[in-house]
Swiss-Prot record:
Primary gene name: Spc25
Protein name (record): Kinetochore protein Spc25
Keywords per UniProt: Cell cycle, Cell division, Centromere, Chromosome, Coiled coil, Kinetochore, Meiosis, Mitosis, Nucleus
Purpose of the protein: Acts as a component of the essential kinetochore-associated Ndc80 complex, which is required for chromosome segregation and spindle checkpoint activity during meiosis and mitosis. Required for kinetochore integrity and the organization of stable microtubule binding sites in the outer plate of the kinetochore. Participates in SAC signaling that responds specifically to disruptions in spindle microtubule dynamics. The NDC80 complex synergistically enhances the affinity of the SKA1 complex for microtubules and may allow the NDC80 complex to track depolymerizing microtubules.
Organism of this sequence: Drosophila yakuba (Fruit fly)
Cell division as UniProt keyword: yes
Cellular compartments annotated: Nucleus; Chromosome, Centromere, Kinetochore
Family: Belongs to the SPC25 family.
Domain of life of the source: Eukaryota
Amino acid sequence: MAIIMAESSYERRVKALYEKQIRMEALEGKFIKKVYKFNSNLLDVKEAVLRHQRKVGKLQKVVMERREELEKRVSFMEELAQELEATKLRNLAMKDQIKQRKMLARQRKNEIMERIHTLSKTTGTYVNHEALPARVKGVTVLRGDKRDQLIPFDLNATDAEGLDSLCQHLESLNVDVSQWQQLVSLAMDVAMEARAPITPPKEAANCKSIIEIDLTSPTSHQA
């Protein structure tokens, strides 16, 4: 009887150990599944992190490129503003210079015209300014007690022989030829200046106009 009870107790222990082993194997299986799932999820997370890092890297590269482009544009605009200001100052200086030259030219012309008027009265000579500078045309009036003598002249400006002959004739009539020649010379200068094309100062050739400044951004040709 004692032997039977001992065997029954042994079987229960063996059965309990077997059931415990079954439970442990089941728990181990569940644990392995959880570990596998965790590792799988961890791998997915790592891949997602890598994808995110790649995106962040690309975004950082774009941000860096945009920042460099913005810095270049800011630098370009600063240079452009400086160039515009320098051009504005050059243009103002040139306008003042041209204004000053025009004023001096008017003053000189007035002085010449006054001198011409004086010489015209002194020599009694009236020059046809419309004929100049191609021709020397006019009339010299010799005042007389009874009547005045008119000496008209109409010569090609390049006719040196004719002009010399005219001067000799006037000199024979007691006309101050040096003043007469000075009168014709001044009238010729006025006529040539009036017909000469207006040329800007030499500085104007080196002065860049505002509209000629390259307004293309240095970053506009980036790939």
